[in-house]
Regions:
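Glycine-rich active-site loops that engage anionic ligands at enzyme catalytic sites
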Residues: 1-228
Length: 228
């Protein structure tokens, strides 16, 4: 475990040297982030976890000079024994050809039939490793090894909102229309980010996610419901 300054109002706790097991490191980061969030350390204003690290943001005017020592001592005492409650979220996804812009490419890369690709993608349980890139974008760990294909050589300038995509060992969902280089294999009618909501992002780090295949008709119906 190493600490690195992140400007003058944050620090990063890096766990990469603790284990070669990425799943264990992710569990460690999520556990420590959850513990720090609940610790109410004076001056700490936000905690953000990633695959192998945790960023702690603080108010320099309110926190004591020995912030690193306090956080180091807390993390050492909390360790991986501290667990975070995991929500389980189901994401409806339509794999219709109009939405699955890169399904043919994934089929060629994996030598799998379309139905097998969809079955593998929708039968796996994913963990939200972190939120980033754009507000509400979930980086999902747990993609089947059989579906691990490289990013597009030339990213799109516009990926439709709700696009369900995969790249290398990760899956993800684009909350907004935005540039992107992942392989789009479907689309969800859910809104992943609402700036007006009390909790703007639908998904949070540590959540468990499963995709449920839906028809085009159900997709359109859900979109209409969301627009009311």
């Amino acid at each position: 475990m190493t600490f690195h300054p992140l400007g003058d109002s944050a620090l990063t706790i890096d766990f990469a040297d603790e284990s070669p097991d990425r799943e264990r490191l992710l569990a460690r980061a999520l556990s420590v982030a959850g513990a720090l969030e609940g610790a109410n350390i004076p001056g700490v204003i936000d905690v953000t976890s990633a695959y192998e690290s945790v960023a702690v943001f603080f108010d320099p005017a309110r926190i004591e000079r020995d912030v690193e020592e306090k956080i180091r001592a807390f993390v050492a005492s909390a360790g991986i024994r501290v667990s975070r409650k995991r929500r389980r979220i189901e994401i409806p996804a339509c794999y219709d050809a109009d939405f699955a812009l890169d399904l043919a490419r994934v089929e060629a890369e994996t030598n799998l039939l379309v139905d097998a690709i969809i079955a593998l993608h929708s039968s796996s349980e994913y963990t939200v490793a972190c939120i980033g890139f754009v507000p509400g974008f979930p980086f999902l760990a747990g993609l089947s090894e059989k579906l691990r294909v490289p990013r597009l050589e030339s990213p799109r300038t516009r990926v439709p909102a709700g696009s369900v995509a995969i790249a290398n060992a990760q899956a993800g969902i684009y909350p907004f229309e935005s540039p992107g280089g992942w392989n789009v294999i479907g689309r969800t009618p859910l809104r992943l980010f609402d700036a007006k909501a009390q909790s703007p992002a639908l998904l949070h780090a540590g959540d468990r996610v499963r995709f449920r295949r839906i028809t085009r008709q159900e997709f359109e119906m859900r979109v209409k419901e969301n627009s009311k």
